Amino acid sequence: MKRDTILFDINETTLDLAPIRSEFISIFGHKSFLQLWFSQLLHLSTVSTITKINTTFLELAKTALEDIAHKNNIEIKSNAIDSLLSKFATLKPCDDMLPGLELLKNNNIRTLALSNSSNQLIKSQIKYSGLLGYFDEVISVEEFGSFKPDEKVYFSAAKRLKKDVNSLMMVAAHDWDVHGAMSAGMGGAFLNRNSLYYNPNFIKPDIESDNMISLSKAILERNE
């Protein structure tokens, strides 16, 4: 199916988390705690969605940090948490993102950002990273009252764009995001940046690549 509107996840997919990874090493002593935190954040957001808890990305991110610190007997001060989370607003794009996005834009593909970050945070991220001219729209799940991978988010994004959900494709570096989008009827592209495991029980992505340039080429080839 030809798809001329592509949605992009932001944290780790579009923006480089190297500064965040360094903070985790400084606080927790090992980079593996970053993925542990991501897993706990996903768990908390999923529980919040199912039980209809009204919360924000920032609140969940802070709680997830405190939780993994507590479980691993690591003392973490509130100012250290604030310092770590503030770095999300000043992340730079991954090296392959700009040429990959340019390739799509030059071929009349509409590109949009769709993130679990708050509306305020994602706008700060896109502005600081210099990506304003690369996304036609920037969408936070905050306006839908849920979090990815809830199907509601993907359906709501399609409705907001006045597009059939089947005409959209989601690009993400996280298997749960790709699976969530495809469960809702979108196409899915897995940008496997860090040799991450893709759950075999999830819907197989339409496209998989370890860099954005080749992934963009694959999207264009599917549209021919």
What is the meaning of each model-derived region?
Residues 21, 34, 38, 58-66, ...:
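An amphipathic alpha-helix signature
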Residues 58-59, 76-113, 123, 151:
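Short, acidic loop-to-helix structural element flanking the phosphoryl-transfer center
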Residues 1-42:
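Active-site neighborhood of HAD-like aspartate-dependent phosphohydrolases
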Residues 30-38, 71-82, 165:
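Short, surface-exposed acidic
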Residues 46-82:
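A metal-dependent, Asp-based hydrolase signature
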Residues 20, 33-34, 80, 131-134:
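Hydrophobic side chains within well-formed alpha-helices
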Residues 1-3, 8, 102-105, 114, ...:
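Asp-based, Mg2+/Mn2+-dependent phosphohydrolase catalytic module
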